[in-house]
Design a protein with these regions (language model features):
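Basic, polyanion-binding surface patches
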Residues: 1-134
Length: 134
C-alpha cells in the first residue's frame, strides 16, 4: 500500500491481506496497525494505491515491511511519483479513495473505493504463505 500525505511525504507499507468488500461500488479493505508509519497519513477522502507485487519484487516487500528501512522505501526508480505513488512493474495497481476508517483495538480498518486499476497481462504474482514467499 502506498500514498502521499498532505505534507508531500511518500509512504508505503507491506500489508498481509487485501479483501474485496463490494462490487457496487467497487471497494476493498486493508487493516493498518496504529503504530505503522503510514497510519496517520490515511484520512477519509485521501488517496492510496494497492500494489500487487510480482514474483521478482520480494525485495520491495521486505523493504516496505521493515521499520528500519522506512526512509529508504522510495529510493531507486521503481516508483512512479507523479501523483499517488505506485510501483511501475507491479503485477497490478489498484487506486482508491479512503471511504471509511474504522478503529478496532490495535488496528484501523481502511475501506477504499476503487477509482482505477491497471495490471500486467502475464500473471506472475508474489504470494506469502506459511512464512515464506512463493
Amino acid at each position: 500500500m502506498s500514498n502521499i500525505d498532505n505534507k508531500g511525504t511518500y509512504n508505503a507499507i507491506t500489508v498481509s491481506s487485501v479483501t474485496s468488500v463490494s462490487l457496487d461500488p467497487p471497494s476493498l479493505l486493508v487493516c493498518i496497525n496504529k503504530t505503522a508509519g503510514i497510519h496517520d497519513s490515511i484520512e477519509e477522502g485521501s488517496s492510496f494505491c494497492i500494489n500487487l507485487l510480482n514474483k521478482n519484487q520480494e525485495d520491495i516487500s521486505n523493504l516496505c515491511s521493515s521499520f528500519q528501512e522506512e526512509g529508504n522505501r522510495f529510493e531507486g526508480d521503481q516508483w512512479d511519483l507523479n501523483r499517488i505513488p505506485f510501483l511501475r512493474d507491479a503485477q497490478a495497481n489498484i487506486f482508491c479513495i479512503v471511504d471509511k476508517l474504522i478503529s478496532y483495538h490495535t488496528h484501523t480498518i481502511v475501506i477504499g473505493h476503487v477509482t482505477d486499476s491497471k495490471s500486467k497481462d502475464e500473471i506472475n504474482t508474489l504470494t506469502y504463505v506459511d512464512g515464506k514467499y512463493e
